[in-house]
Amino acid sequence: MKRTFQPSVLKRNRSHGFRARMATKNGRQVLARRRAKGRTRLSVSK
């Protein structure tokens, strides 16, 4: 049986990367929440 997680850096960054987050209002809210919480890594790409 094929596993569900087939890693790809490109797909990962396109959907969850910093620029993808900045592209939408909700994505910016995600980053703001993570900054407020004090996360070292705001997104997977950064």
UniProtKB/Swiss-Prot annotation:
Keyword set, alphabetical order: Ribonucleoprotein, Ribosomal protein
GO MF annotation list: structural constituent of ribosome
Keyword Membrane: no
Domain of life per record: Bacteria
PANTHER family associated with the record: LARGE RIBOSOMAL SUBUNIT PROTEIN BL34M (PTHR14503:SF4), MITOCHONDRIAL RIBOSOMAL PROTEIN 34 FAMILY MEMBER (PTHR14503)
HAMAP family: Ribosomal_bL34
Name under which the protein is recorded: Large ribosomal subunit protein bL34
Originating species: Pectobacterium atrosepticum (strain SCRI 1043 / ATCC BAA-672)
Gene name of this polypeptide: rpmH
